[in-house]
Amino acid sequence: MKKFFLYLIAFALPPMVSLAQERQIKEKGKTFFKPHPFLQLQGGAAHTLGEATFMDLISPAAALNLGYQFTPVFGMRLGASGWQGKGGWVAPAQLYEFQFVQGNLDLLFDLGALFGGFKPKRAISPYLFAGGGYAYGFENGATAINTNDYDLEYLWMEKRGFLGGRVGLGMSVRISDAVAIILEGGATILDDHFNSKRANNPDWQFN
């Protein structure tokens, strides 16, 4: 569990821009929440948990999310993400890459609004998200590594889909009523076949 949260922190560095329509209604000294759609653009880094050093398994990542904020606390988003995953083989030591794209549906919970109420001018709003996704892998570099005749039971040769669960934390920094910069770290828990190696436990992709 400690390692999980360390990865979340490590990949919460690249910023994400969030654009939203007007989210408040003003009336003579009162401000009311207005449900609204939003758009999120993200770029950063990812890490595929595997048998290699941490830095060797870092790869680029990008995401696009479209969502809707139903209440000050609760929202949903539909997104597409992915780019590249990496894996490592121990003997002889080798690295390989594979490409993937992922669709995801997340539930969002604004912790600032949950515990402090709706405040449209709040500078920093932490949030939690959880959901599910489907990753579609292709161009698997594991097909070309030297395994000394060891049979990779979970090797996928061309293309393959993987169901997964998602969870993560984020922080929204308000720039204006319509724009925010977001720092987010998350993990996707995928089928054991994702990195082509059998480990009898789920594969993890952090970004």
Question: Predicted regions span which residues?
Answer:
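Bacterial Sec-dependent N-terminal signal peptides
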Residues: 1-25
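Residues that define the transmembrane beta-barrel architecture of outer-membrane proteins
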Residues: 35, 56-62, 99-103, 124, ...
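Residues on the lipid-exposed face of transmembrane beta-strands in outer-membrane beta-barrel proteins
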Residues: 41, 45, 64-68, 105-111, ...
